[in-house]
């Protein structure tokens, strides 16, 4: 059966939301695109801090300038504005991404600023649920696991033009202190490598990061040590309207918990989705993070839930969704982590 035009658009939309940018300027070798979304959403849960309105607006700008036939300059900024806070609340806006750099043809790109950490190159493959997901080891401002500040990033696609589908990332993160201890980091390095076997439907990836820990982090009750390390590996299949992905990672003295960090955390994520030709996309996933060697606790699940979701795409710009997070944590877990289910219901307009 032939794929419909709608199904093809939706598969591209799901694969990379950033490609939905609208070009607003393209003249004299300078280009400017804008993109964003309005997510009108409500959480239903017995957990009071999660129950209620979760509406937000996300807006971004991508710019590019052709310096010469080989060298291109670029920049990107992305911010999020809460729609569930009062107008006088100064915490309603946050910067997600802010970086600038240069790209030299087959030799790769280099940029600096607030960006995605190298470990997220693997974790992104399973961060595909309609609302939840991607939270076993990836957390914002947690070393190089997700979005973070002070990142110098080198990326090379197709390995200098020699191997189709072999992509390399090298990253350095400068220390960030003077903030909440769990959001701090010392100097660190990271790398990732992915390969799609020359343009096939299958892909594999791996990543590793190592960072110095700060003095403030070592003053916390749990997980003392000079280094925070992580590694991850992933598999992905994306073809014939089917999306399958799985990820396994381990962190050392990096994953934040009550009273500090877990000395070790083992993390697993999996997702399966199917895009129907008429716009419906069901999703089934599982996320697990198990803390090990925790002072006064031993082993304990940090994250453990089944996710069942459903998205209906009216077109490439508008969708409605429901996402059910079925919490599998024990109510008497020793770290006092919430064990309530959450249902997210909403609509998204994206451009």
Swiss-Prot record:
Leader sequence segment: 1-21
What are the GO MF terms of this UniProt record? porin activity
Asked if DNA repair is a keyword of the record, the answer is: no
Q: Which key words tag this protein in UniProt?
A: Cell outer membrane, Ion transport, Membrane, Porin, Signal, Stress response, Transmembrane, Transmembrane beta strand, Transport
Conditions for induction:
By phosphate starvation.
Q: InterPro entries recorded for this chain?
A: Gram-neg_bact_OMP, Gram_neg_porin_domain, Porin_dom_sf, Porin_gammaproteobac, Porin_Gram-ve, Porin_Gram-ve_CS
What organism is this sequence from? Klebsiella pneumoniae
Entries under Gene3D superfamilies matching the protein = Porin
Enumerate the transmembrane spans: none
Q: Which NCBIfam families match?
A: PRK10159.1 (NF007544)
Q: Which Pfam families does the record associate with it?
A: Porin_1
The job of this chain, per UniProt, is described as:
Uptake of inorganic phosphate, phosphorylated compounds, and some other negatively charged solutes.
Q: Which locations, inside or outside the cell, does it occupy?
A: Cell outer membrane
GO BP terms in the entry: monoatomic ion transmembrane transport
Q: How does it sit in the membrane?
A: Multi-pass membrane protein
Q: How does it assemble?
A: Homotrimer.
Q: Which GO terms describe its cellular component?
A: cell outer membrane; pore complex
The name this protein goes by in its record? Outer membrane porin PhoE
């Amino acid at each position: 059966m032939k794929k419909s035009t709608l199904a093809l658009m939706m598969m591209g939309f799901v694969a990379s939301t950033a490609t939905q940018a609208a070009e607003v300027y393209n003249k004299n070798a300078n280009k400017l695109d804008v993109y964003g979304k309005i997510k009108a959403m409500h959480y239903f849960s017995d957990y009071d801090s999660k129950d209620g309105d979760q509406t937000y607006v996300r807006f971004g700008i991508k710019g590019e300038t052709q310096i010469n036939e080989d060298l291109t300059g670029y920049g990107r900024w992305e911010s999020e504005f809460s729609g569930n806070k009062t107008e006088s609340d100064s915490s309603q806006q946050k910067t997600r991404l802010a970086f600038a750099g240069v790209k030299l043809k087959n030799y790769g790109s280099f940029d600096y600023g607030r960006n995605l950490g190298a470990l997220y190159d693997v974790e992104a493959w399973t961060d595909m649920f309609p609302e939840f997901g991607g939270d076993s080891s990836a957390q914002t401002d947690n070393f190089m696991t997700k979005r973070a500040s002070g990142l110098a990033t080198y990326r090379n696609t197709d390995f200098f033009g020699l191997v189709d589908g072999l992509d390399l990332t090298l990253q350095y993160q400068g220390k960030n202190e003077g903030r909440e201890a769990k959001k701090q980091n010392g100097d660190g390095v990271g790398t990732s490598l992915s390969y799609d076997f020359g343009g096939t439907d299958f892909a594999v990836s791996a990543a590793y990061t190592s960072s110095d820990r700060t003095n403030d982090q070592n003053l916390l009750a749990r997980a003392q040590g000079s280094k925070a390390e992580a590694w991850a590996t992933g598999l992905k299949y994306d073809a014939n309207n089917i999306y399958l992905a799985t990820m396994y990672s381990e962190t050392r003295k990096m994953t934040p918990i009550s009273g500090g960090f877990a000395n070790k955390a083992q993390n697993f994520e999996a997702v399966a989705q199917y895009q129907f030709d008429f716009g419906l996309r069901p999703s089934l996933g599982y996320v697990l993070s198990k803390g090990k060697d925790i002072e006064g606790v031993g082993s304990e699940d940090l994250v453990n839930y089944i996710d069942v979701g459903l998205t209906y795409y009216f077109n490439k710009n508008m969708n409605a969704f429901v996402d059910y997070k079925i919490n599998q944590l024990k109510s008497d877990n020793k770290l006092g982590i919430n064990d309530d289910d959450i249902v997210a219901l909403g609509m998204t307009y994206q451009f």
